[in-house]
Amino acid sequence: NSGSEANDLAIRMAKKHSGNKSMMVLEHGYHGHTQAGIDISDYKFSNLKGEGQKNHIIKAEIPNEYDSQKSIKTGLSSAEKAIKQIKNSTDSIAAFIAETIVGCGGQVPLAPGYLKTIYPEIRKQGGVCISDEVQTGFGRLGSWFWGFEMHEVVPDIVVLGKPMGNGHPIGAVVTTAEIAHSFEQGVEFFSSFGGNPVSCAIGMAVLQTCLLYTSP
């Protein structure tokens, strides 16, 4: 019923599919208020009242588009630093999760070229690429329906939240058939009120409205 719960499920799916435990995240990122969400949210664990960075977390710098007028150089430079972190890690990575605009970091768009460079490196590790679209999805960026579209990449998992219901508490995880099948072999996902008909009706109405006003 929320982006937090959806991100929690995405983490479980990534770890089950990859067989790995480590997660790569961005500085100032926020992915929810569950324990698993806090563990991957620098915005939370680096807070003065936070629990600190866990051993299985690899934190990369934000490829900040505002840092340089030549933002493509910024994206590639940040990607190269992240790749070094990946190669220096003793553990293989389960997933890389990022928002395309880092909300709690100051609404910072990721610099061009970053995701196109980092995604293949994550996949070489057997990891999956997660796009957290809780704040950016469903046309909220104007020119793109999904944030990852402006970076010309295709994630392995996409996480959706309340914009799916125009603020109504609803969330979803979209992934490939291969990852979904891997997750079927693990502990069952269960939600007491999952698939609530009222929430589903609201979600469908929002989607139909989006399609009505975004179709050419």
Locate predicted features.
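PLP-dependent aspartate aminotransferase-fold enzymes
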Residues: 1-95
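Short acidic, glycine/serine/threonine-rich loops at helix termini
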Residues: 11-12, 34-40, 71, 107-108, ...
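Active-site nucleophile and cofactor-binding loops and adjacent substrate-binding regions
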Residues: 1-4, 27-30, 135, 161-165, ...
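Active-site PLP attachment segment
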Residues: 35, 149-182, 195-202
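Conserved small/polar residues in nucleotide/adenosyl-binding loops
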Residues: 213-216
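Short acidic, glycine-rich surface-loop motifs adjacent to enzyme active sites
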Residues: 90-106
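Catalytic PLP-binding core of fold-type I/II PLP enzymes
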Residues: 92, 108-142
